[in-house]
Regions:
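Cation-handling catalytic/transport regions enriched in His/Asp/Glu
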Residues: 1-179
Length: 179
């Protein structure tokens, strides 16, 4: 949560003006450039989200198969048939290099990337509601999330900060997905 959460301030004009400036003049980032950056951030974000969900579902199903032999390509094909917007050509073997789920310590855990985005966006939405530099909200995040680390179950920490369980709404909004 913290690493993705902190990225949110890099998309806020007030935060960018506070932490950055032109290397020679000190002038802030021009507003029109920030607007173009914000527009580009959401470009095909729904496609990227579906792709991440495809990877997560593939990972779950692959690691839920019992027995010594798994038809990896068959599992991937069935996932793609169900969720892919654009199915790669049959010669594509991306799974052979998908190290996250085989050698990266994320076996049956690839979904955690998307879950971290849900938590990050929802936690940040509290700052959007209260003001991105709100001292009390910052202290609450510090004491309920950062200082606690892994000392309590993550959901308990999130609820202590946000006052409720996570919702996906903020991630969809931050991704430019309306619906």
């Amino acid at each position: 949560l913290p690493s993705q959460f902190l990225e949110n301030w890099c998309w806020e004009e007030d935060a960018l003006n506070f932490i950055s400036g032109h290397y020679e003049t000190g002038e802030p980032l021009p507003a029109d450039l920030l607007e173009r950056m914000l527009a580009a951030r959401d470009y095909q974000s729904a496609m990227q989200m579906v792709r991440q969900l495809e990877f997560s579902l593939f990972d779950f199903l692959l690691h839920s198969e019992k027995g010594s032999t798994v038809d990896v390509q068959g599992v991937l094909d069935s996932v793609r048939d169900e969720v892919a917007v654009s199915v790669p050509p049959s010669f594509n073997r991306f799974q052979n290099g998908f190290g996250h789920i085989f050698a990266g310590g994320y076996a049956a855990g690839y979904y955690s990337y998307k879950w971290a985005e849900v938590l990050s966006a929802d936690a940040y939405s509290k700052f959007e509601e209260d003001g991105i530099f709100n001292r009390e909200t910052g202290k609450a995040f510090l004491s309920n999330i950062l200082e606690m680390g892994g000392s309590k179950p993550p959901m308990e920490l999130f609820v202590a900060f946000r006052g409720r369980e996570p919702k996906v709404d903020a991630l969809l909004r931050h991704s430019g997905i309306k619906g």
